[in-house]
Amino acid sequence: MAPGLPVTPAAPDGAGSAVPPVTEDTGASDTPVTPAARKKRRVLRAVGRWTAVVTVFAALGVGTAYGITTMERTDVPGLATESDGRWAYPEITRPPLPAGSPGPQDSGNWSGGHFADLRELLLPAPAGATENKALRGTDGWLPLKDFLTVFEDDEGRDAVGQQLTDYGLRHVAARGWTTEDGTRSAVYLLQFDTGTIADELYGELTGYAAPQHALRGAAETEFDEAHPTSADPAGVMRRSYDEKKPYGAEHVRQAWLRIGDTIALVVQARKGSAAAVPFQQTVVLQSQLLS
């Protein structure tokens, strides 16, 4: 599928998964980067380091988990070892801010706005993954109707579509990929005029026990208690959900984030089961890019 074409239409109720199928991408990025821009960007090393990682396997009583206690704003966690299932993400770079513009959590930024290009705040695919070109949308913006295909049924799609319209959705940027083990990932960034607006809508879309509207392939979910809050960067609101057993055609994990004027949805799905560690890693990385 070529860039700019819409995402595959939603499957009938109860069928399919919230993560769209991936089409092979062999091309380079559509957005050129000048040498001057590269010099302005802070390079966040995502391979070869976690900052202050705390292993909590025994404490949580699970096979693999992790937490982060301290982290500089310019640090993004990445691959430390291969033994715990973390993915090898490439070098991650925050785009430069316009001259004089604050970050989304700076004290002088009353609106909580992201002044960098939202499309450049999307997490890149990890090494060896195949990108879903359909999620690029048009000029990097995904049409609202295509984003709404992540929801399970027409009722959910209609309700969320009306909420996004009422709250003045500005843009949707998205990226998706499939890793070699068959795990399919999708990241959606939804931007609004202010952090206050995004915060109010975030509360309407999420709940403690489950999101307000089910994603495709995950009709029954529960709050993911195993996702450590110590991994969340300061100022990031997060609610993670796991599909209840027995799983459908795929095991679906999802996390809703709110940072400043932006709501993010991270979804991973895999036949059989979707591992917790790469999901948590992806959520933390995307949170850091938006912080």
Feature-to-residue mapping (PLM):
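Intrinsically disordered, low-complexity Pro/Gly-rich regions
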Residues: 1-37
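Hydrophobic single-pass membrane-targeting/anchoring helices
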Residues: 25, 30-115
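Short glycine/proline-enriched loop/turn "hinge" motifs that connect secondary-structure elements
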Residues: 41, 178-180, 255-259
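A small/polar (G/S/T-enriched), proline-flanked helix-loop surface module common
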Residues: 110-244
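Extracellularly exposed regions in secreted/surface proteins, prominently low-complexity, repeat-rich
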Residues: 206-291
